[in-house]
Amino acid sequence: MELNNLKPAEGAKHAKRRVGRGIGSGLGKTAGRGHKGQKSRSGGFHKVGFEGGQMPLQRRLPKRGFTSLTKEFVGEVRLSDLEKLPVDEIDLLALKQAGLVGELIKSAKIIATGELKRKVVVKGLGATKGARAAIEAAGGSFAE
């Protein structure tokens, strides 16, 4: 057995359906599409979601929610990230310099994930109730 002699098993491959190539093929003239009507024409098919004139599902259901335009400008920082910062006074600029938030971020919020064991002073940043409690328990404070 050599690679150049390999062939698929007998009957494993089917010939491609050649439609519209004479009546002897069984698929001549109308090519299996029947007579007339939208489905027999080229390009003749309804759009996705079309329900025959009935009000389509995506228009029957109400609109919900919205996309916040400010979401991409607000950053989140974990307590465990603050633990790694070399500075004791933490503000937005310090977070940007450490690479914890992106350059386009305009405000940030500290969330209570991980733990903080050292004293830090947080300036101009928001914090969740749990994060605020953890920072104050570690001897830290908030300066607005």
Swiss-Prot record:
The keyword Ribonucleoprotein applies. Coiled coil: none annotated. SUPFAM superfamilies: Ribosomal proteins L15p and L18e. PROSITE patterns: RIBOSOMAL_L15. Keywords: Ribonucleoprotein, Ribosomal protein, RNA-binding, rRNA-binding. Residues 1-57 are annotated as: Disordered. InterPro entries: Ribosomal_uL15, Ribosomal_uL15/eL18, Ribosomal_uL15/eL18_sf, Ribosomal_uL15_bac-type, Ribosomal_uL15_CS. One of its GO terms (biological process) is translation. GO terms for cellular component: cytosolic large ribosomal subunit. GO terms for molecular function: rRNA binding; structural constituent of ribosome. This is Large ribosomal subunit protein uL15. It comes from Paraburkholderia xenovorans (strain LB400).
